[in-house]
Amino acid sequence: MTFAEFNQSIAGDPAQPPAGLRGAAVALWHDARGNWDAAHDAAQADKSKAGSWVHAYLHRKEGDAANAGYWYALAGRRMPADGVTLAAEWEQIARALVSA
């Protein structure tokens, strides 16, 4: 799936992510559709570094910097610098996941 296809799937009507989408990408899909709880559940279930990265992003989004920092560390990443928007980070993660 390309990044463009991923974005098109978000804009569509289905209540469930596209077939074949897994783990952290499912979490980002739910987040983009406004379902933080489903996104968090999917990220938490994905024990990979990618899952930890999305998990970190979600806690950053909710304003829990301490918890986000923990998950960024598990993902082997640093918390984004001040000024990096949530939208920019979401796109960075999505591009990394759907092109992987």
Annotated model-derived regions:
Residues 1-49, 59-62, 66-69, 73-100:
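N-terminal alpha-helical interaction modules that lie
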Residues 53-54:
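Alpha-solenoid helical repeat scaffolds
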